[in-house]
């Protein structure tokens, strides 16, 4: 039995169900779930149409490395999105389609972690797959608490001796749950640390297309590499998904791009362990990465939700403002976050996720998720506004 299994924590949504188990919400109020970051947008017509047209391809096996057309569409998208030269991304060497970033983020640790006393560094709070990947690869998780001023991991929290043991660092920008986005200067510091200590950077950029200011798309790790003249993307991998960008979390389609040596090793690993994308999914993904209209329209709807919800909550909860990116609010709570979430559900039938379900206590006892909740503005506007009114009434009634 893998020893790491006994170290895994219950998943946040399992913990949320346990939190709810002892109480019942009012039957007079319909349930509103703002706890799970699952887009509620209708799937883009370009995707559903292509899936229907290509469904006959289910009779064929697909190659793990993906079709040439899909890899080329991904390479073109990366060049457009991050203003890279057309030749910067070679679809044959820099790109690997994957069945969603969840499995890829987990599998990359199994691919690159070696023997010895390895560490895997990650933000705190964090997407729980990072920790599971570290533990099940035999590594020690090292938690980088997000800095209150930036919402990004504080790189000064790890001493030099620990950095020397780090073999893989997960960075999430735009960040779940804080909504912060790293700038090029932050990426430069990461690259310098990687050069000094030799660890691989796995940049989870699945929220890269859900940003607030249409004129300021967040930069990414490959763009930072290009700005530094690192055309080989050495020790750098980025992970992207259609789940958030195109509102198709059930499609399970994404990609990994970057260092060709790492891509080659990852392809070898996934040839044995991974699941190749079905051909009809690859065709739909090719269409999705080639279209920007549906993404721009979705961003406008998210922007409207944030503007209106924040206007209703900013005077009753601390730190409520439209984030740089993602579809999350990360406000402070006037009481313990788990108690807040439980009572809100019990009284208003609104589900939000306690911040401490996404974080771990640091060595000094400080838990950067404690006293906050994550609010996912994924339902339609009217539902988000109804939820905001219920949250507002709840806070005003008690605090």
Predicted regions and their residues:
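Helix C-cap/helix->beta junction micro-motif
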Residues: 23, 137, 196-197, 348, ...
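N-terminal small-domain helix-loop-helix segment of the aminotransferase-like
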Residues: 2-100, 107, 288-289, 397-399
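Conserved glycine-rich beta-strand-loop-beta hairpin in the small C-terminal domain of fold type I
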Residues: 282, 286, 302-310, 319-333, ...
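Generic structural signal for small/hydrophobic residues in well-ordered secondary structure
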Residues: 16, 34, 51, 74, ...
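PLP-dependent enzyme catalytic core of the Aspartate aminotransferase-like
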Residues: 84, 231, 343-351, 358-399
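Conserved core of the PLP fold type I
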Residues: 59-192, 209-210, 214-230
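Conserved core segment of the aminotransferase class I/II
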Residues: 223-303, 307-310, 394-395
């Amino acid at each position: 039995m893998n020893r790491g299994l006994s170290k895994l924590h219950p998943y946040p949504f399992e913990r949320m169900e346990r939190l709810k188990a002892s109480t019942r919400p009012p039957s007079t109020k319909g349930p509103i779930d703002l706890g799970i970051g699952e887009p509620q947008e209708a799937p883009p017509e370009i995707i559903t149409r292509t899936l229907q047209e290509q469904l006959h391809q289910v009779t064929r096996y697909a190659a793990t490395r993906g079709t040439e057309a899909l890899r080329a569409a991904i390479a073109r998208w990366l060049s457009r999105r991050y203003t890279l030269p057309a030749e910067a991304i070679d679809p044959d060497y820099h790109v690997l389609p994957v069945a969603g970033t969840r499995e890829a983020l987990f599998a990359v640790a199994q691919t690159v972690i070696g023997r010895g006393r390895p560490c895997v560094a990650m933000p705190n709070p964090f997407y729980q797959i990072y920790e599971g990947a570290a533990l099940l690869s035999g590594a020690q998780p090292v938690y980088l608490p997000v800095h209150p001023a930036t919402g990004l991991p504080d790189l000064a929290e790890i001493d030099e001796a620990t950095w020397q043991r780090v073999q893989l660092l997960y960075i999430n920008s735009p960040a779940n749950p804080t909504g912060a986005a790293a700038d090029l200067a932050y990426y430069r510091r990461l690259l310098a640390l990687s050069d000094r200590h030799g660890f691989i950077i796995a940049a989870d950029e699945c929220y890269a297309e859900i940003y607030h200011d249409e004129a300021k798309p967040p930069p990414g790790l490959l763009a930072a590499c290009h700005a530094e003249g690192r055309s080989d993307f050495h020790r750098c991998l980025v992970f992207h998904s259609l789940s958030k960008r195109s509102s198709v979390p059930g499609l399970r389609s994404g990609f990994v791009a970057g260092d060709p040596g790492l891509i080659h090793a990852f392809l070898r690993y996934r040839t044995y362990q991974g699941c190749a994308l079905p051909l009809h999914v690859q065709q739909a993904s090719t269409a999705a990465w080639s279209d920007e209209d549906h993404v721009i329209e979705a961003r406008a709807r998210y922007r409207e939700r944030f503007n209106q919800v924040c206007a209703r909550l900013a005077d009753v909860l601390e730190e409520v403002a439209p984030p740089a990116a993602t579809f999350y609010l990360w406000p402070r709570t006037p009481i313990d976050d788990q108690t807040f979430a439980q009572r809100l559900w019990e009284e208003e039938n609104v589900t939000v996720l306690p911040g401490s379900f996404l974080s771990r206590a640091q060595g000094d006892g400080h838990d950067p998720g404690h006293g906050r909740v994550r609010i996912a503005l994924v339902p339609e506007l009217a539902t988000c506004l109804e939820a905001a009114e219920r949250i507002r009434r709840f806070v005003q009634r008690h605090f």
